[in-house]
Curated annotation (Swiss-Prot):
<feature type="compositionally biased region" description="Polar residues">
    <location>
        <begin position="101"/>
        <end position="111"/>
    </location>
</feature>
<comment type="similarity">
    <text>Belongs to the Mediator complex subunit 7 family.</text>
</comment>
<comment type="function">
    <text>Component of the Mediator complex, a coactivator involved in the regulated transcription of nearly all RNA polymerase II-dependent genes. Mediator functions as a bridge to convey information from gene-specific regulatory proteins to the basal RNA polymerase II transcription machinery. Mediator is recruited to promoters by direct interactions with regulatory proteins and serves as a scaffold for the assembly of a functional preinitiation complex with RNA polymerase II and the general transcription factors.</text>
</comment>
<dbReference type="InterPro" id="IPR037212">
    <property type="entry name" value="Med7/Med21-like"/>
</dbReference>
<dbReference type="InterPro" id="IPR009244">
    <property type="entry name" value="Mediatior_Med7"/>
</dbReference>
<comment type="subunit">
    <text>Component of the Mediator complex.</text>
</comment>
<keyword id="KW-0010">Activator</keyword>
<feature type="compositionally biased region" description="Basic and acidic residues">
    <location>
        <begin position="24"/>
        <end position="47"/>
    </location>
</feature>
<feature type="region of interest" description="Disordered">
    <location>
        <begin position="1"/>
        <end position="57"/>
    </location>
</feature>
<feature type="region of interest" description="Disordered">
    <location>
        <begin position="222"/>
        <end position="247"/>
    </location>
</feature>
<feature type="region of interest" description="Disordered">
    <location>
        <begin position="101"/>
        <end position="122"/>
    </location>
</feature>
<keyword id="KW-0804">Transcription</keyword>
<feature type="compositionally biased region" description="Basic and acidic residues">
    <location>
        <begin position="234"/>
        <end position="247"/>
    </location>
</feature>
<keyword id="KW-0805">Transcription regulation</keyword>
<dbReference type="Pfam" id="PF05983">
    <property type="entry name" value="Med7"/>
</dbReference>
<dbReference type="GO" id="GO:0016592">
    <property type="term" value="C:mediator complex"/>
</dbReference>
<dbReference type="GO" id="GO:0070847">
    <property type="term" value="C:core mediator complex"/>
</dbReference>
Length: 263
């Protein structure tokens, strides 16, 4: 009776929380904090600030009602239940043969069986080719299924099983193709990032050329001003104009820098 109630609980659409939540009371939490402070005392007898890991908490001498407050160790093997269905902890995709389903495509490329040397690398499976074949088989089997229903509907089970097997094989092939799809997506993202970086480098080179031209012009104006140090009024006026042009060129450099940085 208890097992049946537990199965109903696991299979409900919105499963209730596990019963251990009842132990998360303010008193139990306070007792756990006191035990942690007591265990973290140093040689001077004063508690030290410490970030406790679940493994360290499990190593403490805790009463049974407080042990439920400590996170359990994360399992790396075995199964877990989701709405009454067992799920494997392993992320590896099980083969159709392991699941007791007939596999309609080869496990490796047919060219691998004709290899002369076993040291040669195996060729990847042509997923698109076999997906297309399975899609055509689905259409053909569906037409046959409709024909069976029109002639002798009581013999539909075999065709339904064939359609089910074809759909499972197509779905499994798509799952096998996902790692390749992830690699292609990563390659595309890296190429976009590389193109953006090259564009930024080109903009920086262009800005560098503009600033270099302005600095060379300033240097030429400075050399020309130092080569004619006359003290006449006309030269003083020219020197004032040169100084004004130097200020304008310097302002141009800052405007260029501000514009590129803001852009």
């Amino acid at each position: 009776m208890a097992d049946a109630a537990q199965q109903r609980t696991l299979a409900t659409a919105f499963a209730p929380p596990p019963p251990l939540w009842k132990h998360f009371t303010p008193d139990n939490l306070k007792r756990l904090e006191e035990i942690k402070k007591e265990a973290s005392k140093g040689e001077d007898g004063k508690p030290q600030k410490k970030k406790w890991s679940p493994a360290e908490l499990r190593a403490l001498d805790l009463p049974p009602e407080l042990r439920l407050l400590v996170p359990p160790a994360i399992p790396d093997t075995g199964h877990y239940s989701v709405f009454g269905e067992l799920q494997n902890l392993s992320t590896a995709l099980p083969s159709l043969k392991d699941q007791g389903i007939t596999q309609l495509y080869p496990s490796s490329s047919p060219a691998d069986t004709d290899r002369q040397s076993p040291s040669e690398p195996s060729r990847p499976l042509n997923h698109a080719y076999y997906l297309l074949k399975i899609s055509k088989s689905l259409l053909l089997n569906f037409l046959e299924f409709v024909g069976v229903l029109s002639v002798s509907p009581e013999q539909f089970e075999s065709k339904v099983e064939d359609l089910r097997n074809l759909f499972i094989n197509a779905h499994h092939l798509l799952n096998l193709y996902r790692p390749h799809q992830a690699r292609e997506s990563l390659i595309m993202m890296m190429e976009e990032q590389l193109s953006r970086t090259k564009e930024e480098i080109q903009q920086m080179d262009k800005l560098k050329a503009e600033i270099t031209g302005v600095l060379e012009r300033l240097e030429a104006d400075g050399i020309a001003a130092q080569s004619h140090p006359q003290q006449t009024d006309e030269d003083g006026r020219k020197e004032s104009e040169t100084s004004q042009k130097t200020i304008e060129d310097a302002q141009l450099v800052w405007d260029l820098l501000d514009g590129k940085i803001e852009g």
